[in-house]
Amino acid sequence: MRDAETQGLVLYSRNYKEKDKLVKIFTESFGKRMFFVKNFGKSSYASSLQAFTDGKLTATINDGGFSFIEDVSEVVVYKNISADIFINAHASYIISLADAAISDNQYDPALYGFLKRSLELLDQGFDMEVVTNIFELQVLHRFGVSLNFSECAFCHKTVGPFDFSYKFSGCLCPRHFDEDLRRSHLDPNVIYLINLFQEISLDELKKISIKAEMKAKIRQFIDGLYDEYVGIHLKSKKFLDGMSGWADIMK
């Protein structure tokens, strides 16, 4: 065990015994850790350990079991995420995705920063689907998946239009469409936007407008990539998918 200070983002918590809780926190310095909080309801920092909060932790880090929190300060609460069920669903999904992407205790400050920035953008009102798509695509390599959407897999032509081939795990230009008769037959704009989302920095992201029809095509394609190359099935993703018809009902 060692005492340390680190930034930490609360992923989730669950009850443990009658009055205690286990709180999973993605720390900047020590990766994802499970913290034991005794008498959670009476804890002076219980409100700082809710979902969608980030803060500075003073803690005892244990590599072989539960870690322990001494204090939480400089707390940031993503209030808009907590208040809006649709933003909340997208945030919950990317948190689950980050949790699945690396092992517990694995040091990954880049992923911590990427997740934190994604939540900040969601909280600031950036397009939920766009932020989520960017996160999904840029976290793929942590699942061991490396896909190139910027050029033809055969001739390396970098000017589209392109289609995607699962057979070759890459893009095809029109000259090489015949190499895979079962290619995806995508709208060329899907590949263009997928490549953009895979490469863009969240710090460069500006508020953009994408039509619902195009968003649906992108969603379907990314789902296909995850089914083919990753193979995880998260409850948060299933819940998010089930919300597709809610917007019209709640108007």
UniProtKB/Swiss-Prot annotation:
Biological process per Gene Ontology, one example term: double-strand break repair
InterPro entries xref list: ARFGAP/RecO (IPR037278), DNA_rep/recomb_RecO_N (IPR022572), NA-bd_OB-fold (IPR012340), RecO (IPR003717), RecO_C (IPR042242)
Stored SUPFAM superfamilies: ArfGap/RecO-like zinc finger (SSF57863), Nucleic acid-binding proteins (SSF50249)
GO cellular component: bacterial nucleoid
Pfam annotation, one family: RecO_N
UniProt keywords, alphabetically: DNA damage, DNA recombination, DNA repair
Function: Involved in DNA repair and RecF pathway recombination.
NCBIfam families recorded: reco
Entry's family note: Belongs to the RecO family.
Name of the featured protein: DNA repair protein RecO
Native source species: Lactococcus lactis subsp. cremoris (strain SK11)
Name of encoding gene: recO
